[in-house]
Structure formats: C-alpha cells, structure tokens
C-alpha cells in the first residue's frame, strides 16, 4: 500500500508542478532534487532487491557495498549499466516535464504543494522506510532483553557418542520442496526430508540472510552484526572472539571439525570465522584443486557440487574408518543466484516452469540430487548408526530466476535432521529461526539446548515464539551483538608484521592491505580484497577532515605523496587527512612499529580535490617513471600511451587475457627506435608453452618461445616505418579460472609478462 501511495504522491507532484507552478529557479531546483531523491531511493531498492530479494537490508551493507558476494560479477554488468542509463533517462525526463510550462508566471501555492507532495512520496516509499530502519538500528544503544535471552552454553558435551554431518545447501530454502507449487522439483532430497525430523517454519531474521551470516547464526546463535561496514570480516584475525559457538563445543568435546566447500575460503571471511571457532581442517577451492579428479571442472565460484560432495564422502569414509569423533560441514554452491550451475553428473539437468526451462529451478533439481546421493551413501554405510545428518539452507534464495515464483508461496528456510542412532519421522511446525539450528543440533548430541539467542526446537522456546515482532527485536539488539566483537575504539601505536602481512593495534589483528578511518571514539576498518573496491577508491570517499591510516603496497600511494616509491611492492604506511597533511613511511623491518600522528591543520580544498582526483585514476591510466614496463605494479611507464589485452597486476606480473583483446598491444607515445632490442621476461600458459608466439612491430614480425617458467628472451628489431605499437599474439589462449577472482568469468590466458624493456641500439 505504501508503495502505491508513494508513486501516487510522486506523480501528483510532477503533474501539479509541471502544469500549475510556473517558472521559478529555486522551486524548480528544490522540487527536482526531492523527486530525484525519490527516483534514486527506488532504483537503489530495485538494485538491492535484485541481489538480496529482500530490499535494502544488512546484506546490502555487509556485502554489496564492497564485495558483490551475491553473484558472479559478469552476470550483473548489464543490469548495472541498465540501472545507470535508466537513472540518467529519468532525471532528464523529469527536468523536461517540470519545465514544460516555464514561461507561465510563478505560483507559490502550487509550487509549495508540489514540493510537499514530493516530500510525502519520499517519506511513504518503502526504500526510505528500509533505510531509516537500518540507520536507527545503527544508532540504538541496545535492548534490555538481550541480557535476558543471550545464554552461553557449556563448553563441552558430557558424553558425546555421535558424529555430525552438516550440509548447507546454498539458497536451498524449504519453499522449493512444496510439491504442489513445484511438482517433482526435489524428489530425491524431498523423500529424505520426509524420513526425518522436518522443521517446517524456520524464518529468516535480519543479519542471517546471506551465506556467512547464515553460518554464524546457525553455529553461534546470533545474527551477523559487526562494528564495521563492508566485507571487513575477511581482514580481521578473529570472528566474534568472545562467543562460544557449536564448533568450539565440538572441538572441546574431542571432535575433529572439517569444512569442505567449492569456493574460496577467504570469501566473506569464512576461513576466519571457522578457524576462530574450532575448525582445524578447511578445504576450499585452493585446497581441493590438488586433490580433485578434474581441477578444470569449475564454475564461476569454484568446484561444482558433485565434485565437492564426492570429496566430502571421501572425508566421511576416511574419518569413520579412523574411529575418531568428527564433524563434517559442507557448503554447496550450484544453486547460487542469479542462475545457478548444473553439475555434469546429475540426471536432472532441466526443469520447466510455466512451459519453459528455468535455470534456477534446474540448478535446484540438480543440486538436490547430488546432496541426496551423498546422504544415501552415508545411510548405506555401516557408520550411519553413529551419525547425525543435518540439511539446511544457509539463507532464503536471493533474486534468482525463480524468485518471483517463490514469492507467491509462504517462504521458510530448510532444516531437517536424519538420525542414524534413532530414526524419527516427524514434521514439526514450531515457529523458529536460523539461530535455533545450532542449539537443536547440540541438544541432539547431548549438550545444552541453547547457544546465544538460539534455542533447541526440541526442548526450548525460540525467540520467534516469544516475540511477535522478532525482526524488530533482533534489530534492537544489534548494538549488544556488536559489542560482542570487543572491537578497539582507538589506535595510537601499531605493529606491522611484514612476513605475516598483518597489522596489530589495541589487541586486534588485521590482514593487509587495510584502510582505517579514525575518529575520537571509533576505528573503522575498510579492507581490500578481490571483491571490494581498491583502498584508494574507498579513501577517495573520505571527507577532507577524516583521519586515515592506510597500509598498502608503496606503489599504490606513491603517485600521490611518494613518487620515489612508484615501483616498490613493499608495504608503506600513509596517514593524515586528504584535505590536510599526509605522510608516507616505508616499512623496512620485519616487525615495524608505528604511531598515529594526526595534526590539526587548516584544510585546503584544492589539495583535497587534487588528492581525490588522483586516487580515482583507474589502474590502466596510471603512469610512472621507469625504463621498462613493470607488470606487477599498476599502470605503465610514462612513454606508454595506452595498452590492451592485459589482465590485472598480480604479485609476479600480469597475464595476457584474450577476453580483453585478442592480442597484447602496447602503444607508445613516440615511434620506437629505428633499431632496438626487445627484452621480454615472461612465461607461457597451457598450450602456449614451447610454441612460436608472434611478436610484431610495424611490418616486422619475429617469434618468441616461452616455457611454463619465467625466462628472459631478447629479440632484435628494425623499425624503418617508425611504428609505435608492439603486438604480441599468443597462439592458443586458454579459458581458465587459474588465479581468477571468485565469481568472475574465466579469463583466456596466453602469456604471463614480468617485464618488457625497449633498448635503443641505433647507431
């Protein structure tokens, strides 16, 4: 209703101003600004909803602002461009409509009415309400009920007898198992669900609605609320360090805890969370690539579910044979939005809905088949009698191609349990939430029936039953939950460990690189990973007086304040204010001690603007002074005009990438010498090794032969035509996820370049 009201008020404001208000610059600007805010809010809501399926929520703050955890990046480029174009078009149309009758005399009454209606449209919009609620949740002091309901369990299980297999199905919510709504979509796993304890009303709460948040909620009994924005959990060295979670209890009780997934463990800080809470054996994309049968069989996120669950079965079998007590957690990925992925071994590769194939439903049908096969192997084994199997969704499905059909149903998370020691078939309709999962499992294993805010659904009462407004209650507890991090509020002295690539201050440790925004009562960490904006772009958003400490590779800050370090890949520390003074210090010791020193200087807005503009220069436009092209730093030598076909810098250099251009092209500002040596330090990828690689300058072509290891080759060129472009054409670019960023489409690699140098031998 509020959505319709806000649209009606918006249209009324536009019509009244366009036809009755007349000409007045101030009223026009004010009305256009408010109407434009309405448009921006709703486009933000649409964009957020596209990722989360739940509008503007904590998942947006935690993930989308910096990390794009919601999707393979390539699949969102077109929607992003579409949103930007729509924004420009709507603003242009608004301005044109509002000025349609600009030659008519101004009428204050109608102008005021139009402005009030515009303000009303903003206030009534769901986007404004959601943002307001998020802001309120950030500013609350806490809720007195938190101390009443937050309970810390005993650290051990008195007499543990059962092993645990816990399967997180990516976005695999219980709604998919409604056979009336989606006939024969989940027959294999649905049949298993009906054999066990099936909890049919597991609701989703704020702070539990994306993968790492769902894992934290299900193991620690609390939502994932943090004292920082973005994906900073990937940079911290510990995760809710004061909490006792399910993994801690299992480890203290003699369990060996294992976690297996197909994606990179660093993604969203899963490795930090698991290591902080009892898991000593972690297997992700990097760990599995040396043991799986086919390392090239991957999707955009990592290994397919059939591969991951095969490895999980091998772990289960080996651990069971060893006789040691263990837990085995695994996380699937094939059902990740927006489309999902189809494993090649499943029989169910296609599911039609409304008379046409639907990729998301197809991925669900395939993945559930793989999960069911894994479970049936366990059930058929002699070790099932000593095992508890848990199957749950990590969160409700986000905006995938099945989402509009899911939204027509009563949506709940999946959570069911199969007990090998005590088979029990029952559907339990008790109201519960994801925070209750860990407590329910702990209860079955013989421990307490509570963890944090979670309660066992077999012997306790969930917060979802206690509070009718449980979502609002959880948001009110957000400050209390944030305090559990015990996060430092100041930084005076700090230590950088050059070997471990970490910084320590006030008892906390973070991975490098890192940007800190420092105020009187708060230190906000802003990390950089493959999934977030580069730190210099994040720093460019700081206000002129914001104090910062920036620890990064020297060359990244050299173009601003330390040109002598333009080619250094060592660590440097910069601190100051963008509108004031900045310092840069080279980290030249293994254990480097530093202190913060923020001077209260006069702010220079011209300096601020210059710093921001320089920080925002894209990598390929950066130029440095050097007599060669150094590929492990961003940019190119000053002599280079432009280049293409080259991927991002890595620690050793850069790959050619045929996705960015069929050939490597380096265009220099001036003609290359009449006679020169081209010294190339490089290596080849895949089938490009030990094959002739054409290298052209003007009309002259030579060949380069490289192996898989880095070597240096010198080619002798004549350049009578004064050509200024160097072209290298790898003969067989290979599509691969080697060294790729999680969620990005595969690159097509040819050669890996470390350095290219032009040596003038003319005369």
Swiss-Prot record:
Spans through the membrane: 1-21, 26-46, 77-97, 108-128
Keywords linked to the UniProt accession: Cell inner membrane, Cell membrane, Membrane, Transferase, Transmembrane, Transmembrane helix
Catalytic activity: a phosphatidylglycerol + a membrane-derived-oligosaccharide D-glucose = a 1,2-diacyl-sn-glycerol + a membrane-derived-oligosaccharide 6-(glycerophospho)-D-glucose
InterPro entries, per the entry: Alkaline_phosphatase_core_sf, DUF7024, OpgB, OpgB/LTA_synthase_biosynth, Sulfatase_N
EC identifiers of the protein: 2.7.8.20
Biological-process GO terms, alphabetical: glucan biosynthetic process
Bilayer topology term: Multi-pass membrane protein
Top-rank lineage group of the source organism: Bacteria
Cited function: Transfers a phosphoglycerol residue from phosphatidylglycerol to the membrane-bound nascent glucan backbones.
Similarity field: Belongs to the OpgB family.
Protein name (Swiss-Prot/TrEMBL): Phosphoglycerol transferase I
Origin species: Salmonella newport (strain SL254)
């Amino acid at each position: 209703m509020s959505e319709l009201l806000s649209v009606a008020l918006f249209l009324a404001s536009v019509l009244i101003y366009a036809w009755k208000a007349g000409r007045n610059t101030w009223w026009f600007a004010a009305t256009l600004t408010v109407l434009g805010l309405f448009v921006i809010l709703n486009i933000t809501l649409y964009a957020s909803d596209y990722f989360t399926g739940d509008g503007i929520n904590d998942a947006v703050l935690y993930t989308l602002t910096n990390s794009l955890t919601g999707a393979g990046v390539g699949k969102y480029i077109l929607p992003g461009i579409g949103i930007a174009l729509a924004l420009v078009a709507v603003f242009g149309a608004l301005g044109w409509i509002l000025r349609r009758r600009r030659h008519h005399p101004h009428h204050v009454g109608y102008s005021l009415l139009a402005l009030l209606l515009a303000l009303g449209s903003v206030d009534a919009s769901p986007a404004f309400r959601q943002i307001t609620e998020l802001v309120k949740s950030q500013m609350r002091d806490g809720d007195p009920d938190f101390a009443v309901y937050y309970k810390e369990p005993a650290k051990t299980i008195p007499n543990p007898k059962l092993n645990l297999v816990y399967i997180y199905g990516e976005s695999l919510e219980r709604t998919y198992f409604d056979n009336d709504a989606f006939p024969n979509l989940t027959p294999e796993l649905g049949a298993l669900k009906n054999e066990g304890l099936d909890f049919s009303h597991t609701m989703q709460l704020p702070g539990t609605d994306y993968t790492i948040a769902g894992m934290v909620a299900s193991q620690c009994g609390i939502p994932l609320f943090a004292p920082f924005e973005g994906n900073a959990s990937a940079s911290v060295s510990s995760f809710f360090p004061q909490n006792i979670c399910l993994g801690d209890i299992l480890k203290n009780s003699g369990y060996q805890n294992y976690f297996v997934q197909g994606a990179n463990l660093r993604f969203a800080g899963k490795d930090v969370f698991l290591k902080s809470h009892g898991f000593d054996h972690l297997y992700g994309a990097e760990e599995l690539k040396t043991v799986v049968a086919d390392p090239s069989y991957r999707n955009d996120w990592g290994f397919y579910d059939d591969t991951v669950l095969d490895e999980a079965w091998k772990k289960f079998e080996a651990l069971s044979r060893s006789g040691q007590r263990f837990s085995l957690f695994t996380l699937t990925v094939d059902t990740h939005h927006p489309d999902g992925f189809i494993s090649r071994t499943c029989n169910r590769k296609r599911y039609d809905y409304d008379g046409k194939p639907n990729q998301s439903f197809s991925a669900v049908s395939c993945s559930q088949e793989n999960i069911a096969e894994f479970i049936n192997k366990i059930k058929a084994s002699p070790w099932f009698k000593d095992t508890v199997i848990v199957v749950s969704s990590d969160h409700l499905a986000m905006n995938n191609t099945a989402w509009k059909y899911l939204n027509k149903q009563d949506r709940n998370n999946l959570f069911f349990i199969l007990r090998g020691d005590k088979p029990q078939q029952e559907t339990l309709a008790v109201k519960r939430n994801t925070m209750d999962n860990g407590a329910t499992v702990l209860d079955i294993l013989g421990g307490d029936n509570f963890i944090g805010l979670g309660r066992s659904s077999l012997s306790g009462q969930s917060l979802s039953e206690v509070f009718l407004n449980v979502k609002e209650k959880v948001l009110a507890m957000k400050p209390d939950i944030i305090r559990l991090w015990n996060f430092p509020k100041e930084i005076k002295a700090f230590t950088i460990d050059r070997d471990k690539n970490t910084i320590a201050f006030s008892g906390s440790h973070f991975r490098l690189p890192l940007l800190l925004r420092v105020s009187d009562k708060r230190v906000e960490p802003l990390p950089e990973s493959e999934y977030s904006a580069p730190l210099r772009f994040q720093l460019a958003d700081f206000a002129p007086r914001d104090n910062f400490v920036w620890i990064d590779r020297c060359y990244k800050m050299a173009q601003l304040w330390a040109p002598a370090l333009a080619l250094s890949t060592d660590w440097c520390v910069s601190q100051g204010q963008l509108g004031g003074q900045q310092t840069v210090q080279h980290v030249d010791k293994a254990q480097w001690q530093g202190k913060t020193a923020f001077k209260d200087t006069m702010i220079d807005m011209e300096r601020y603007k210059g710093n921001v503009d320089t920080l925002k220069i894209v990598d390929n436009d950066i130029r440095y002074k050097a007599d060669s092209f150094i590929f492990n730093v961003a940019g190119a030598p000053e002599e280079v005009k432009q280049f293409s076909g080259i991927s991002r810098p890595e620690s050793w250099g850069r790959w050619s990438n045929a996705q960015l251009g069929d050939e490597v092209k380096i265009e220099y500002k001036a003609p290359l010498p009449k006679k020169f040596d081209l010294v190339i330090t490089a290596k080849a990828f895949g089938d490009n090794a030990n094959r002739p690689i054409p290298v052209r300058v003007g009309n002259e072509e030579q060949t380069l032969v490289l192996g898989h290891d880095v070597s240096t080759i010198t080619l002798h060129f004549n350049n009578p035509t004064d050509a200024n472009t160097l072209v290298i054409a790898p003969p067989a670019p290979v599509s691969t996820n080697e060294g790729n960023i999680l969620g990005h489409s595969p690159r097509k690699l040819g050669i890996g370049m470390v350095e290219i140098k032009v040596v003038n031998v003319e005369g």
